[in-house]
A protein has these predicted regions:
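Extreme N-terminal, non-catalytic leader segments
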Residues: 1-22
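Hydrophobic anchor at the beta1->P-loop junction of P-loop NTPases
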Residues: 26
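ATP-binding Walker
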Residues: 32
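Short beta-strand-centered segment that lines the nucleotide-binding/catalytic pocket of NTP-utilizing
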Residues: 46-61
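ATP-dependent small-molecule kinase phosphotransfer cores
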Residues: 57-124
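ATP-dependent NMP and nucleoside kinases share a basic, alpha-helical "lid"
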Residues: 115-122, 127-160
Length: 218
């Protein structure tokens, strides 16, 4: 991976479209069930790429680690000749400092998107799904042919965040308040709302319905 120009989306969406691929972003608020949806789509046999796994891939690149550490002013950890982000220190910093959070995101979000789209371009199959938590906040909507918005009742999604991340409900609500408001947003005619208000089999059926709609419209 390049260690410079990380903020540039290097033509990967165009490459994917030219090769006949249909790119679908899977998004939604915190705790909505995006990762669960991605797991189900993978079980259907479709190529899927997540922001978290892409970020972990980037963390193996010393140049990326140095760039991020320098951007937020947190010294990287060096171990056995490799550089590692001090993720705990950075997490504590950006949770309380909105300016530091924006600095971090100005580096990490474009890099994650570029790497994810490169991976999607190289994937087998003509229908590829990418989990993009900050699709609208980051201005990435136009990079995808279709969007799945996963929606879940607030009580259930905040409970999921408390259980998953060890945060309080108040912290979960605070994070949600900073994100795009999906509650009354259904998107454009190539946006499919997937209601996650039941069990896994119900979510699976709704995802199948969304896929059938994509196949008809693409």
């Amino acid at each position: 991976m390049r260690n410079n120009g990380i903020g540039v989306l290097a033509g990967s969406p165009e490459k994917a479209r030219k090769s006949g691929k249909t790119l679908v972003a899977v998004t939604g608020g915190i705790g909505s069930g995006k990762s669960t949806a991605i797991g189900i789509l993978s079980s259907f046999g479709y190529p899927v790429f997540g922001a978290d796994e892409t970020y972990r891939e980037l963390l193996t690149d010393d140049g990326f680690v140095s760039l991020v550490s320098g951007k937020v002013g947190v010294k990287p950890i060096e171990r056995d000749g490799k550089l590692f982000l001090d993720r705990k220190a950075i997490a504590e910093l950006v949770f309380y400092d909105e300016k530091a959070k924006k600095k971090l995101e100005s580096v990490t979000h474009p890099a994650i998107m570029e790497k994810m789209l490169q991976n999607a371009s190289a994937a087998k199959g003509d229908l590829v799904f990418c989990e993009v938590p900050l699709l609208y906040e980051g201005g990435y909507r136009d990079l995808f042919d279709f969007v799945f918005i996963v929606k879940r009742p607030d009580r259930a999604r905040f409970a999921a965040v408390v259980s998953r991340d060890g945060r309080t409900e108040e912290q979960a609500r605070e994070i949600a308040s900073r994100q795009f408001d999906y509650s009354a947003y259904d998107g454009d005619d190539r946006t499919i709302v997937v209601e996650n208000d039941g069990d896994i089999p119900q979510l699976s059926e709704r995802l199948k319905e969304g896929i059938e709609r994509i196949k008809k419209e693409k």
